[in-house]
C-alpha cells in the first residue's frame, strides 16, 4: 500500500506518521502498534508482521506498508543537486549512464533515490560512499509521483507505484 500527501505546514515526520497510521488502520483494522528503532536506526513495528517505510521531501510525505520488507525514498524533481557528487556516489557502470544522460540532474536524483531506498531496505543505512551499489537509469522501481521521483524496493517483487 502506498500513500502520499502534501506537507501543508506539517513536518515530514508528522505527515509521514499520519500516513502510516491511516495505511495501517486500512490494512489491519487495528490502531498503529508501537514502533521501535533497530541497531542501525531503522524503525519497525515491535509486535506486527507488517513492514513500513516513510520518506519526505520539502513538500511531500510518502509512506509504504507491506507484509514484506519494503523501502521508499523520494526527491522533488525540481531539486537541483551538485553534479560533482556523481564522482563520489556512483559506481563505474552508473557513472557511464550518468555521463550519457541528457538530463544529468534527473539522472543523479534517480540513482540517489534507488541507493537511499536500498540502504533503507537493508536496515543498515548508507555507510561510507554508496558507490558499491549499482542501479540502472531505467529501473522500473522509480516513478514520478506528485512532482517527485519515488523509488520503492522490496525483498520480493517490484512494488508498482
Which residues make up each language-model segment?
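Core catalytic alpha/beta fold that binds nucleotide/phospho-ligands
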Residues: 1-161
